[in-house]
Amino acid sequence: SYADMMKNKELFDICAITGLILGEKAENTNYRNIAIMTDADHDGLGSIYPALLAFFSNWPELFEQGRIRFVKTPVIIAQIGKTQKWFYTVAEYEEVKDTLPKHSIRYIKGLGSLQRDEYKEMIQNPVYDVVKLPENWKELFEMLMGNDPELRKDWMLG
């Protein structure tokens, strides 16, 4: 119910900040887009899903309009002389590490691992991934989150 959802402090705060109102379309929000920023590790990425589910189940139009974005956060920062190169996945770094000039790397375990100037750079010049939905998103949502467990079982069992 609406009352139960508003008891969730995080969801309540998000609604208060963004101007989103449960039960209403996201038409008159305080911001054009909503950017989600978490640690790039498995824990941080795992925390995205409850937020996405809350947005998706209440305001799917935000996804249809490309208004939900992730702020990409670095996993590795390579120091090459006085310049830095940020990598958002280990695979991205592994792909080019042998072509980089002599460098040192620092693994970023979370946003708290960033130095103040790095954090400022990420806030002032964010790199976004826009969440895009497949055309059959309504069917998928109903299958995965709907009231018919047989649909989920069929999907999981292939």
What residue ranges belong to the model's regions?
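Conserved phosphate-chemistry cores used by DNA topoisomerases
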Residues: 1-158
